[in-house]
Amino acid sequence: MKNVTDSFVSLGDWPYAGSFAFNTDILATNPINLSVVLGVLIFFGKGVLSDLLDNRKQKILSSIRNSEELRAKAIEQLEKARARLRKVEIEADKFRVNGYSEIEREKGNLINSTYENLQRLENYKNEAIQFEQQRTINQVRQRVFQQALQEALETLNSCLNSELHLRTISANIVMLGVMKEITD
């Protein structure tokens, strides 16, 4: 133990300035102290540093895995969105085609119904014209008949005198009698 205490005591003994001597005191020499400190740091710090690096590595790997999972989910959602978009585009095309065909069908129906309405109106017009023609013809016939009857009455009245009138009545009575005998 005396050697240990002597070494501490010798710390107080410094060589004089300008002299050169070899210091055999291990604790007093700086390179040895540094190597010891570095050795202790390496020996004990190696585990701590290794743990820190392992933790950091695990965090980085975990972050990469999470990023990969998020990327995979994003790709999956993108594919689903693209599939929905294609489906919506197909449905839109169907609606567009059906809409155009519906418009064409309605257009055809409208043209057909308009044509039928025009045909009915044409028939009504023709019937009205025929009715008016028939009515006019009947009115003309009736008027001609009335005028002919009026002229015949005027002619008879002007030609008939009482003697001719009596003879016509007698002849008609005889004809009625003969007709009665024939029918009996």
From Swiss-Prot:
<dbReference type="Pfam" id="PF00430">
    <property type="entry name" value="ATP-synt_B"/>
</dbReference>
<comment type="function">
    <text>Component of the F(0) channel, it forms part of the peripheral stalk, linking F(1) to F(0).</text>
</comment>
<comment type="similarity">
    <text>Belongs to the ATPase B chain family.</text>
</comment>
<keyword id="KW-0793">Thylakoid</keyword>
<keyword id="KW-0375">Hydrogen ion transport</keyword>
<keyword id="KW-0934">Plastid</keyword>
<feature type="transmembrane region" description="Helical">
    <location>
        <begin position="27"/>
        <end position="49"/>
    </location>
</feature>
<dbReference type="GO" id="GO:0009535">
    <property type="term" value="C:chloroplast thylakoid membrane"/>
</dbReference>
<dbReference type="InterPro" id="IPR002146">
    <property type="entry name" value="ATP_synth_b/b'su_bac/chlpt"/>
</dbReference>
<keyword id="KW-0472">Membrane</keyword>
<keyword id="KW-0406">Ion transport</keyword>
<comment type="function">
    <text>F(1)F(0) ATP synthase produces ATP from ADP in the presence of a proton or sodium gradient. F-type ATPases consist of two structural domains, F(1) containing the extramembraneous catalytic core and F(0) containing the membrane proton channel, linked together by a central stalk and a peripheral stalk. During catalysis, ATP synthesis in the catalytic domain of F(1) is coupled via a rotary mechanism of the central stalk subunits to proton translocation.</text>
</comment>
<keyword id="KW-1133">Transmembrane helix</keyword>
<protein>
    <recommendedName>
        <fullName>ATP synthase subunit b, chloroplastic</fullName>
    </recommendedName>
</protein>
<keyword id="KW-0812">Transmembrane</keyword>
<keyword id="KW-0813">Transport</keyword>
<dbReference type="GO" id="GO:0046933">
    <property type="term" value="F:proton-transporting ATP synthase activity, rotational mechanism"/>
</dbReference>
<keyword id="KW-0150">Chloroplast</keyword>
<keyword id="KW-0138">CF(0)</keyword>
<comment type="subunit">
    <text>F-type ATPases have 2 components, F(1) - the catalytic core - and F(0) - the membrane proton channel. F(1) has five subunits: alpha(3), beta(3), gamma(1), delta(1), epsilon(1). F(0) has four main subunits: a(1), b(1), b'(1) and c(10-14). The alpha and beta chains form an alternating ring which encloses part of the gamma chain. F(1) is attached to F(0) by a central stalk formed by the gamma and epsilon chains, while a peripheral stalk is formed by the delta, b and b' chains.</text>
</comment>
<dbReference type="GO" id="GO:0045259">
    <property type="term" value="C:proton-transporting ATP synthase complex"/>
</dbReference>
<keyword id="KW-0066">ATP synthesis</keyword>
